[in-house]
Regions:
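GHKL-family ATPase ATP-binding module
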Residues: 1-200
Length: 200
C-alpha cells in the first residue's frame, strides 16, 4: 500500500516489497512523479502523464492520470496531504468526469457507434493510475477512519477541472485518445461477455 504526504516534498512509503522503501518526490514533480513511480514496469498507453490543476480562492486541486494496459484501477486521493483511503467527494468528481469525458469524446469522434451503449465508469478506469490531491480551508472528514472527504465543493471543483482539461488533452493527442477509448471499449466488451456467460 502507498501512503503519501503531499506537502513541500512528497513522501511515499511503498510496502509492496518485503522491506518498505521510502521515496521522496520533490514538489516540482509532485504527483506526476508519484504516478510515474506507480506505473513503473507497467505497459503504458501514453508516454507522458496527463496532469491538470485548478486554483480557486479557497481551494486547489491537482490531478495526474496514466492509463496502462493493465486490468486493475489504482486511484489515490488526498485532502490537505491526508491520504483519503475511503475516497470522498473529490474522488467522486474525478470518476464522474472521467466517464463523462471519455464517452463524449468517443461519441464525437465516432469511436462509439450509435447502437453501442455508453461506457461505464469501470470500463473507463480499467488500467488507470490516478491521483487527485486537493487543498481546502475546512475539510470535513467522514467515515469510520475519518479518511473520507465530505466537502461537496471539492466534487464540483475536480469534476469541472477534469471535464475541461482532459477533453482538451484528448483533442490534442488523438492517437493516445483513440488507444484509451479502444482500451475502455475492450473492457466493456469483456464485461458484457462475462455477464452473458453468467446468464446462460
Amino acid at each position: 500500500e502507498e501512503e503519501a504526504k503531499l506537502a513541500e516534498a512528497q513522501r511515499l512509503i511503498d510496502e509492496r516489497e518485503a522491506k518498505p522503501v521510502k521515496q521522496v518526490f520533490k514538489a516540482s514533480g509532485g504527483i506526476v512523479d508519484f504516478v510515474k513511480h506507480l506505473a513503473t514496469g507497467k505497459d503504458t498507453i501514453h508516454t507522458k502523464v496527463i496532469s491538470m490543476e485548478a486554483r480557486a480562492p479557497d481551494a486547489e486541486a491537482d490531478i495526474a492520470l496514466q492509463w496502462t494496459n493493465g486490468y486493475s484501477e489504482s486511484i489515490h486521493s488526498f485532502a490537505n496531504t491526508i491520504n483519503t483511503h475511503e475516497g470522498g467527494m473529490h474522488e467522486e468528481g474525478l470518476k464522474k468526469a472521467l466517464t463523462n469525458v471519455i464517452n463524449r469524446y468517443a461519441r464525437n469522434k465516432g469511436l462509439l457507434k450509435e447502437k453501442e451503449e455508453n461506457l461505464l465508469g469501470e470500463d473507463v478506469r480499467e488500467g488507470l493510475i490516478a491521483i487527485a490531491s486537493v487543498r481546502l480551508r475546512e475539510p470535513q472528514f467522514e467515515g469510520q477512519t475519518k479518511t473520507k472527504l465530505g466537502n461537496t465543493t471539492m466534487r464540483s471543483l475536480v469534476e469541472t477541472t477534469v471535464n475541461e482539461h482532459l477533453m482538451t488533452w484528448l483533442e490534442e493527442h488523438p492517437g493516445d485518445a483513440k488507444r484509451i477509448v479502444t482500451k475502455s471499449s475492450q473492457a466493456a466488451k469483456a464485461r458484457l461477455a462475462a455477464k452473458q456467460a453468467r446468464d446462460l
